[in-house]
């Protein structure tokens, strides 16, 4: 709703993350949000005022944490590498004993730049005053 209500348009410095919800749904959500704005902006005044595509807003201002069993490589391929952040629930059981190894399975064919985005750079882009 923040996208469709124009929150990210009005506050371009606002950053955030969707954590512990998985990310398998993100690529399709981006397509649907873009479609909604394109289709309904002809009849909805608020949507007609949105200048940047919803997918562009989310790439610049949000990130999502996939579950360890979700293929982050496929998510990157079907959307954008700047959308995803590493996370783990370790030491909880759902965090597994090897959270990095779980994601590395899906990132084995990707270069170091993509891995750095996932493991640290995307987080630092959104939260530049953080220390990791």
What do the predicted segments below correspond to?
Residues 1-57, 71-82:
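Histidine/acidic residue-rich metal-binding segments in metalloenzymes
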Residues 5-6, 14, 24-25, 43, ...:
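Mid-to-C-terminal alpha-helical segments outside catalytic/metal-binding sites
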Residues 60:
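Short beta-strand or tight-loop elements
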């Amino acid at each position: 709703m923040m996208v469709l209500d124009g929150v990210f348009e009005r506050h371009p410095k606002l950053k955030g993350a969707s954590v512990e919800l998985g990310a398998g749904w993100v690529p399709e959500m981006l397509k649907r949000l873009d479609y909604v704005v394109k289709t309904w902006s002809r009849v909805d005044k608020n949507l007609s005022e949105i200048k940047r595509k919803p997918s562009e807003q989310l790439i610049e201002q949000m990130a999502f944490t996939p579950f360890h069993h979700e293929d982050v490589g496929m998510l990157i391929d079907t959307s954008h590498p700047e959308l995803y952040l590493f996370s783990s629930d370790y030491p909880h059981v759902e965090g597994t004993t090897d959270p990095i190894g779980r994601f590395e399975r899906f990132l084995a064919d990707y270069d170091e730049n993509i891995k750095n985005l996932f493991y640290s750079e995307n987080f630092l882009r959104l939260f530049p005053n953080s220390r990791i």
